[in-house]
Amino acid sequence: EAVSQALLGGDFNMGQFLLQVVCIVLGVELLAALVLFLHDPVFFSPFSALFHAVSAFCNAGFALAPDNMVAFREDGLVCTVICICIVLGGIGFGVLRECLGILSRGRLAPVTRLSRLSRLVINTSLFLIVAGALLIFVVEWRRAGNEDLVGDGLHLFLISLFHSISARTAGFNMVDMANWSHASLMVLMVLMFIGGGPGSCAGGIKIVTFRLLVGYVVAQVRGDRQIVFHKRGVPPENLTPVSYTHL
């Protein structure tokens, strides 16, 4: 219902929405491809740069190198560009459309002016990204036997952050995953299971479903009759497998 309300409101126009989606996709992918090409024109030829930009934004996780993105594990710019594309592609076109609509008014509006759905998706995404990165960093830092993660703390956290973002929606890797501990792999699997936002390029059960499941467990423990998100309740009858599928 939240997704439908956000996308199919009274002023919704399908043609305008599709045009905005196309503009967002082309704009992000072309800009990312240009940055990659200017940064390293040897590896990122025009085709290679565009391929990796599209692969990142569409959360495909495909790379042209046989070892995926391992060669760029110490390249902060490439890591940042790929991460931004993954996040934007996995947050949902409805959320992106709403954020761009606010920014296009010529001033930065407070976060509270976003819809409840957008705030829920953005806040949960940020939490999962940071929490996943911290867990991987703590587990893998200075762990004996993992030569891929030998270096200063900032570099290790950047790799942890990259994989926290990539695992949930895309699948790129900058290190040999065979060297990771079982604890880190479990963190990655949980992030893969959750996935991205509704109406996005990402897979998984989706962020809204994850929040509903967590909220349902918390409500049962507290003895509450309904889940409350941002001062609004979710009726128990909406917590069905059908609802989970649609979300």
Task: Give residue spans per PLM region.
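Membrane-proximal intracellular helices of multi-pass ion channels
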Residues: 1-247
